Swiss-Prot record:
Functional summary from the UniProt entry: Protein phosphatase that may contribute to contact inhibition of cell growth and motility by mediating the dephosphorylation of focal adhesion-associated substrates and thus negatively regulating integrin-promoted signaling processes. Induces apoptotic cell death by at least two distinct mechanisms: inhibition of cell survival signaling mediated by PI 3-kinase, Akt, and ILK and activation of a caspase-dependent proapoptotic pathway. Inhibits the basal activity of LCK and its activation in response to TCR stimulation and TCR-induced activation of MAP kinase and surface expression of CD69.
Name of this protein: Receptor-type tyrosine-protein phosphatase H
Gene3D superfamilies xref list: Cytochrome c1, transmembrane anchor, C-terminal, Immunoglobulins, Protein tyrosine phosphatase superfamily
GO cellular component: apical plasma membrane; cytosol; microvillus membrane; nuclear speck; plasma membrane
Stated family: Belongs to the protein-tyrosine phosphatase family. Receptor class 3 subfamily.
Sequence positions bearing Phosphotyrosine: 1094, 1102
Record-listed E.C. numbers: 3.1.3.48
Protein location: Cell projection, Microvillus membrane; Apical cell membrane; Cytoplasm
Domain notes: The extracellular domain mediates homodimerization. One or more cysteines in the extracellular domain is essential for the formation of dimers probably by forming a disulfide bond.
Cytoplasmic face residues: 776-1115
Amino acid sequence: MAGAGGGLGVWGNLVLLGLCSWTGARAPAPNPGRNLTVETQTTSSISLSWEVPDGLDSQNSNYWVQCTGDGGTTETRNTTATNVTVDGLGPGSLYTCSVWVEKDGVNSSVGTVTTATAPNPVRNLRVEAQTNSSIALTWEVPDGPDPQNSTYGVEYTGDGGRAGTRSTAHTNITVDGLEPGCLYAFSMWVGKNGINSSRETRNATTAHNPVRNLRVEAQTTSSISLSWEVPDGTDPQNSTYCVQCTGDGGRTETRNTTDTRVTVDGLGPGSLYTCSVWVEKDGVNSSVEIVTSATAPNPVRNLTVEAQTNSSIALTWEVPDGPDPQNSTYGVEYTGDGGRAGTRSTAHTNITVDRLEPGCLYVFSVWVGKNGINSSRETRNATTAPNPVRNLHMETQTNSSIALCWEVPDGPYPQDYTYWVEYTGDGGGTETRNTTNTSVTAERLEPGTLYTFSVWAEKNGARGSRQNVSISTVPNAVTSLSKQDWTNSTIALRWTAPQGPGQSSYSYWVSWVREGMTDPRTQSTSGTDITLKELEAGSLYHLTVWAERNEVRGYNSTLTAATAPNEVTDLQNETQTKNSVMLWWKAPGDPHSQLYVYWVQWASKGHPRRGQDPQANWVNQTSRTNETWYKVEALEPGTLYNFTVWAERNDVASSTQSLCASTYPDTVTITSCVSTSAGYGVNLIWSCPQGGYEAFELEVGGQRGSQDRSSCGEAVSVLGLGPARSYPATITTIWDGMKVVSHSVVCHTESAGVIAGAFVGILLFLILVGLLIFFLKRRNKKKQQKPELRDLVFSSPGDIPAEDFADHVRKNERDSNCGFADEYQQLSLVGHSQSQMVASASENNAKNRYRNVLPYDWSRVPLKPIHEEPGSDYINASFMPGLWSPQEFIATQGPLPQTVGDFWRLVWEQQSHTLVMLTNCMEAGRVKCEHYWPLDSQPCTHGHLRVTLVGEEVMENWTVRELLLLQVEEQKTLSVRQFHYQAWPDHGVPSSPDTLLAFWRMLRQWLDQTMEGGPPIVHCSAGVGRTGTLIALDVLLRQLQSEGLLGPFSFVRKMRESRPLMVQTEAQYVFLHQCILRFLQQSAQAPAEKEVPYEDVENLIYENVAAIQAHKLEV
C-alpha cells in the first residue's frame, strides 16, 4: 500500500476512506511521530527526521513519508527509522512532506512539513569588473525550474578580514565599498523557498589605487626614468607595476617592476613618449596614470671653438645623431673665470658669444633642447684672446741680440699670460720664443740684419692680436781700420766691411774731432775708404768709423791719427866746415808749430874714395831738435851730403825739405918735394886727404896746375922751374866748388937738365893735345847718335854691380819704362812648356783658385796622401829657389774654403814656422783669400789639426799674429808666426817702397832668428804676383849684401822656371827695381867685394880733360 511510486493523493484518499469506514473494532491508531524536522535539503533530496510517537512500540511499526512538489510530483518513502532522505526530487521546488506511522496496518495521523529542495548553484560565476573599491560579478541562472522568486546571495571576505553579504534578484552584482588591492573570496548561492543552493566561489581582487605622484626623474637619449609613490590603500606587497611608453613614432616599450621607479631604455633619442603606469595584482590592473615626456636628444657633435677675439668666442657644432633635428633649440651656457656667466640660445649650429672679458677662460656648455628636454652637455674651455700687448719697444740691441719689452695687455686678468715672440730676419728664416715675462732677448742673431718682431699674448691657447715692430741688430765693427795716407790737410782711411751678411748694403760714417775740441764732424760714404779733407795741419784727430744698416749704427772702430805738419821753409846751410854743416829753416805757420819736433836726416851722396873704405857706414843718419836750426857734426870732410828736414808731431812727419851741401875738403900734407934730376922741376908728393876730393891745384912758385884725384900719394912733377932755386909750394884740395889750401912748403930745384926737361915737356904737350882732340870728337859723336829701333833679339841683363844699379834703373825708365818693358817681355814665355798634369787632374780642379796659375809637376809641394782619397796629396803650392837653396821658399795661393784644411796640412808637414800673407781676404768687393785663422781665442779644427790664435799685434800697414798648431792625434804642437801685409793692392804695387822695405826688414830679422823648421810659406791671392815680388826682393837684397851684385832679371826668370807668372805684372817688376833703388838710397854701406867705385861716362870725360889741362900747364 505504501509502495514506492504511490502518490500522496492516493494515500490521502485511502486514509480518508479508512477514517470514514472505520466502523469495527479496530486496533487503535498509533500516535503520529513527534517533532517532524527537515534536517537537510539538497537540490534533489530532502532529509527529514522525527521522534518516535508516544507509546508506540516500534516493533512492527513503519513510517511513511510522502513529499509532493509544487509541480505535482510526489515521492513516497517508508522506513522503520526515524529519519529518511527523500531523493529524486526536483531542485528548487517547494515540497509538502507528510509523515505518518503505520502499525499493524493502522496509520497514525499525518505529520506534515513544507520544505523545498535546494536550488542548483548559479552557473558560470565570473568576475566581470574590478575597481579599486568594487568587484562586479555576473552569473547565469541555475539549471532547473523557473528561477522566479529566486534570490541570489553573495558573501565576501577580504584578506584583510573585511567581510559582507549582499543579495540580489539579478544575475549580476557589484560589490562596492571594498578595500583597494585586496583579495576577496566571493561565495555565491541561490536562495529560493528559503533554501540556498550550494555556493559557487570566486576569488577576485580589487584593483589598486593608481600610483601617486607619477613623475619623470630623468631622461637620457635612450631612456626615461620614472618614479611614483605607492598607491593609497592596502599594502602593495606582491603587486607589480606595469610601465608602458609609446613614442610619437609608434614605438612602444613595456617594463614591469615591483619597485616604485623604473628606467625604460631602448628608446629613440629626442622623441616624445606617453608613459602609462598602473598597478597589477592578481591579474587586476589599477587605473592608469599617464605622463608625457621625451627622451633627451643626442648631444651636439664636434663642438669646436671656431674663433676667438678679445671680446667674443665663436663656437660651431654639428647636429646630433638621431631623428630630424627640426624644432630643436641649442642652448649655450658660459661661465668665466671671473664669475661672469650667461646663457644664449640659437636654432643654428653656430653662435658667437660676445661682450666677453679679454684674456678670460670661459667654460662653454652646449646642449640640444627638444620637447622641453635638454641633451647632455658638450663642454669646451675657451679663452678670449688677450688684448694686444702695450708699448712694445726695443730695450737694447747688440750685434747678435735684441732685447724687447712691453706692458701687459689691458684686461681684468693679466696673470698667467704667456707671451710669444716671433721674428724673421731679412735673410729669411723664422724663430719663435715664448716667455711669461714682459721682456725677452732674442739671441744668436745675424749682425746688421733687420728683423721683424711680432709679439702677442696667449692664455689657455688663445692668442691676442699681434703687435709688430721692425728692429735691426747692430752691425759689427769695421775691421782693419787703418790710415792709408795723409797730408797736412787730409787723412785717408781704409777699412774692411764688418763680418756679417749684406756687406754691400752698408753705409759708413766717419766721425772726427780735433784734439782739444768737443764738437765732432761727420761724413758718410758707401765705400770702405774715405779721405777727410780741410783738416788742420799737424793736428791729432780722434777718428771713429762705424757701419750703418737699417738706420742702426754699428759698433765703433776707433783710430787716432794725425795730419802731417806743414813743411819747413827757407831751408839753407848757413855755415859749413870740413866736419859740420849748420842748417837753418823757418817753422811752418801752423797753430801747433811750437809743439813740433824737427828731424834732420843726412846721408852721404858719396865721394871718390867711397869704395876704398869697406868699414864705412853710409846708412842715413837722423837727429831731432826742437829748434829751427841744427848743426850737423862729425861729418866726413869733402863729402856731399843730402840734408832733409821735416817737422813731426804725433809721430807724423811733414813733407820734407831737402838740400845738398858738401863739407869742406880736408887739407893735404905735402910729404915730399924733391928736385928733378935736371933741376928744372920738382917732384911733389902729398898725402891723400880724408874724405872726398875731386882734384888738386898745385902752386909752385906762382906756377899753377891741376891734378886729378888719383895724384895724391904719387909723385907729381912740376916742371918749368929754374934750376937751383927755391919755390914755395901749396896744394889746394878741390871738392864741390870748394877749395882748401895746404900749408906752404919750400921746394929747392937742382941746376942740371934744363934742355932735356924742355924737350920732354914739349913732347908731352903734343901727346896731350892729341888725346884731348880724340876724346872731344868721341864725345860729340856719342851725343849726336840717335837711338835706333830695337830689333826682336833682346839682350838679357846679367848681375849688375850695386854702384851701377841706379844708372841701370834710370836707363830702363826712359821712354816710359821702355827698358823694363823689353826685359819683362823676355820673361813672358819662361817655363811654359813644363808639365802641369797633377794640377790639371779633374779631382784637383776645384782646389785651384785660378785656372791659369797651376804649379809645375816637378816643383809642386806634395802632401802626404790620405787613404782612398784621390788627389789628397795635391795643393796649389810650389817650392821656390832662394839665394842658397832651390827650396828656400814655398809659394802658394790664398786658401779656398775647401782647401783650408790642406793649407794647414802643408804648414804641419813642412814644419814651417813662418807664414807671409800679402793680400786682404776681401779686395774691391771680391774674395781673394779665405779667412783661414781663428777670429779670436776660440780654436778652429781642420781634420786632425787644431789652430789657436795666441796673440795679435796690429800696426798701421801690417799685422803680426802668433798661432799655435796642434796635431790632435800625436799631441804635438808647432808655433807659427803670420806676417800679414795689408797695404798691397791686387795686380798693383804699394804707394811707396818704404813701407814694404820696413815690412821686409822685420820679416828678414825674424827669418834670421828662426833657422830651424821648414821654408817660409808665402801667399797672396794667386801666389805669383805679390808673392813673387816679395821673394825676389828678399833674395836680391841679400845678394846685394853678400855679393854687391843685383840680378833682378835673372832671378825672376829663375822663379818662373819653378812657378808660372811669378812677378805677375810689369808694374810689379818695375816696383821691384824701385824698392832696391830705395834700399840703396837708404843704405850707405858698400859691398865689401867691390873695389872699383862707380863713375859715369861724363865724369870720366871730365877727369880726362882735367888731366890734359894739368899736363898742358906743366908744359
